[in-house]
């Protein structure tokens, strides 16, 4: 009788599992911070403009730190840079707990890798996306590892959002005032940052980008200096992808969670508690869709999966805009959310698969920056549309149409550019 036990995820190295755990801890922290940060700043007396500047600082951090990671992480060391960013994450939480001085808080927001968008788009993501292919021992698991990475992050983010209710519990159980009860979550955030530092310290040298090797005339091996840049061919590919992803992200900014929440509240008078339930169910559907996306991609390819799951989701987005009743709107919205993020793990897998190994960090970073910049602009445009047009659902229609156009352009430009593993099939 065979008594050997199968180790779960045996195809994933120890480093890969540590990266997954770091993503869970980080996403959980981002989850509750994304809910409580603006509320806390309002409670301690800052006006909407000052709050907006702090939130903008977090977006600037995402762009600047991702840019630094894109071009220096492989030279300095991926592990070192991850540790440095995690230390800054912990320090920022401590600053928010310790003081209400505006200069200190806006500085903490800029240096602290704080994420308040409800999804993770920062520098950690770019470095980890480049590392993941080196943590699997089976090339066929490439799509699966990105699906797993995104799925656990989504579940952890949802759990973090639920944890944002802890201040209310502390108020009733221990008689704390609202401000002090929220401030304790900054202690938790800082502590989780320390935990992430510990996880990154445990990573091995295997996660680093490998130096190129050349052979001299005497057959001795010589290490070439590591250059964190893209070849002319990769620049062309990543340039096109970045432009297209920027369009997709811009369209996505029309239907970020806060705008969808506003739409449900305004059009149907939905209670905030019900809205939170809708988003929670949507989060679960999204998380499971990542694994389904990996399975589909293994069968039909990454580009086909990205396009032919995305187009139906965007048609559903437009349909939601014309839903006459709340139940119909919820059904179509949830159906849309079950499909809309299936391009995320497949997109990440495709980016690192079509460039050389030493180009992965730069490729992931550049494409993430393009998404961050355009998505930061579109909510303001959506607000202008809502204010200018009599049609409350206009952002849904605009977003859906632009996204469908993106899908069509992506398909016709990249349908024949298959990653090496797909070409072998």
Each predicted region: which residue ranges?
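Helix-to-loop junctions at the C-terminal end of transmembrane segments
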Residues: 65-77, 168, 289-302, 386-387
């Amino acid at each position: 009788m065979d008594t050997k036990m199968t180790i779960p995820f045996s195809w994933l190295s120890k480093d890969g599992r540590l990266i997954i755990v770091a993503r869970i801890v980080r996403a959980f922290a981002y989850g509750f911070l994304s809910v409580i940060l603006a509320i806390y700043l309002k409670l301690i007396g800052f006006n909407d403009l000052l709050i907006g500047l702090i939130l903008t600082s977090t977006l600037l951090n995402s762009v600047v730190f991702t840019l630094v990671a894109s071009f220096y992480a492989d030279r300095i060391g991926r592990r070192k840079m991850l540790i440095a960013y995690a230390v800054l994450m912990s320090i920022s939480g401590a600053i928010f707990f310790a003081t209400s001085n505006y200069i200190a808080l806006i500085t903490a927001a800029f240096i602290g890798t704080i994420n308040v968008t409800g999804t993770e788009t920062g520098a950690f993501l770019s470095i980890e996306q480049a590392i993941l292919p080196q943590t699997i021992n089976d090339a066929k698991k490439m799509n699966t590892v990105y699906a797993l990475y995104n799925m656990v992050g989504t579940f952890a983010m949802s759990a973090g959002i639920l944890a944002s209710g802890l201040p209310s519990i502390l108020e009733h159980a221990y008689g704390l005032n609202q401000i002090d009860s929220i401030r304790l979550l900054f202690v938790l955030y800082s502590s989780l940052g320390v935990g992430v530092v510990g996880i990154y310290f445990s990573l091995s040298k295997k996660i680093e980008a490998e130096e190129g090797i050349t052979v001299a005339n005497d057959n001795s091996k010589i290490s070439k200096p590591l250059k964190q840049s893209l070849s002319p061919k990769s620049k062309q590919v990543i340039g096109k992808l970045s432009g297209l992803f920027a369009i997709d992200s811009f369209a996505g900014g029309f239907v970020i969670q806060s705008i969808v929440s506003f739409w449900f509240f305004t059009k149907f008078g939905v209670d905030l508690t019900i809205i939170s339930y809708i988003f929670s169910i949507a989060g679960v559907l999204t998380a499971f869709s990542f694994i389904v996306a990996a399975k589909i991609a293994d069968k039909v390819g990454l580009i086909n999966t990205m396009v032919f799951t995305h187009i139906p989701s965007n048609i559903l987005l437009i349909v939601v805009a014309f839903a006459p009743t709340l139940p119909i709107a919820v059904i179509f919205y949830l159906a849309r959310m079950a499909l809309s993020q299936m391009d995320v793990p497949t997109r990440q897998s495709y980016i690192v698969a079509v460039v050389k190994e030493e180009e992965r960090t730069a490729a992931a970073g550049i494409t993430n920056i393009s998404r961050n910049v355009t998505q930061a602009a579109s909510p303001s445009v959506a607000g202008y549309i809502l204010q200018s047009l009599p049609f409350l659902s206009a952002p849904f229609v605009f977003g859906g149409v632009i996204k469908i156009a993106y899908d069509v352009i992506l398909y016709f430009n990249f349908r024949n550019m298959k990653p090496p593993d797909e070409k072998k099939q």
